[in-house]
Amino acid sequence: IRELVLHHVGGYLKIAPEHTEQGPLSKMMKPGIGTYDRFRQMFEQFSREAGKEQFLIPYFIAAHPGTTDEDMLNLALWLKKSGFRADQVQAFYPSPMATATAMYHTGLNPLKGIHRDQRGEKVDTVKGERRRRLHKAFLRYHDPNNWPLLRETLKRMGRADLIGNGKHHLIPAFQPRTDGSYSSPRRAHSTSSPLKGGLLTRHTGLPPCGSPQEKKESKQWGDRRKGKSA
């Protein structure tokens, strides 16, 4: 990590903890959020020792198979405690040849073996517009447009204690006038450079749409297709 910090980071480093809860993380075969915390501590320590001001930009995902509403609530609480605010939000979408896609369509965990009886491990899949919108709303807990849905959900979950105007509350009790707008996750990020405390979300392993990396890979793909046609 010291080598990475000293010679291979240009101010920002993107890293993908994906989630804080074991439900979705186990389906992704990802380590727990404690691994990210330890990496962050070493990253910040070595950056200070090198006299550099560098930041981690974490990726998180909404609506991945194996994610419950409680998981998203816990992620939102962790994000607020850590001082992170998502700019654009993208949710999981099934894509070909992905293990998560098999989970999405079957409701079973192929990592544990597929069985139609009680031996099969059932996987909670996030389907339906309202529930998918809810999981996105938890990632953007700071957006006033999401507060009505989050208030309703928190009351249903028996967590009305998280509604209020204190620092320990997730969302305020009052509702300001909003236009109800939502930024499309397919648009480029609204800032040219990530801000401290910012984070990114994704639905696949692809780079953010419109990013320099995405444009570069798209050009390389186009060049390969032209070469094959020739």
Write out the residue ranges for each language-model feature.
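C-terminal low-complexity, glycine/proline- and small-hydrophobic-enriched intrinsically disordered tails
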Residues: M72-A86, Q90-N145, L154-K155
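Acidic, low-complexity intrinsically disordered tails
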Residues: R116, P172-A230
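Amphipathic alpha-helical packing elements
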Residues: A137-G180
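A glycine-rich phosphate-binding loop feature that marks nucleotide/adenosyl-phosphate handling sites
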Residues: L56-A63, A91-A98, L170-I171
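Acidic/polar loop patches that form or flank catalytic/metal-binding clefts of enzymes
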Residues: K52-I57, R85-A91, L162-I163
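A structural motif
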Residues: V9-G10, F84, R159
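Conserved non-cysteine loop/helix-boundary elements of the Radical SAM core domain that shape
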Residues: I1-K80
